[in-house]
């Protein structure tokens, strides 16, 4: 179940960033490296809080 949650989280974040092909991304890249802007950051943060009970600062979100 934990693996499923991680995949769901990855898919949700990729969708927010407009990434269609998950296989094509470098998992060592931060969200900022992948093109995260401030509005996307807020959306990622809200998704993490709402769907995964993770509360992160905007700085932490950018470093993901």
Swiss-Prot record:
Q: Which GO terms describe its molecular function?
A: fatty acid synthase activity; phosphopantetheine binding
> Which cysteines share a disulfide bond?
none
Give UniProt keywords alphabetically: Cytoplasm, Fatty acid biosynthesis, Fatty acid metabolism, Lipid biosynthesis, Lipid metabolism, Multifunctional enzyme, NAD, NADP, Phosphopantetheine, Phosphoprotein, Transferase
The subunit structure is: Homodimer which is arranged in a head to tail fashion. Interacts with CEACAM1; this interaction is insulin and phosphorylation-dependent; reduces fatty-acid synthase activity.
Its protein name is Fatty acid synthase
Q: Where does it localize?
A: Cytoplasm; Melanosome
As given in the record, the signal peptide range reads none
Limits of the Carrier domain: 1-64
- Is Lipid biosynthesis among this UniProt entry's keywords? yes
Gene3D superfamilies annotated for this entry?
ACP-like (1.10.1200.10)
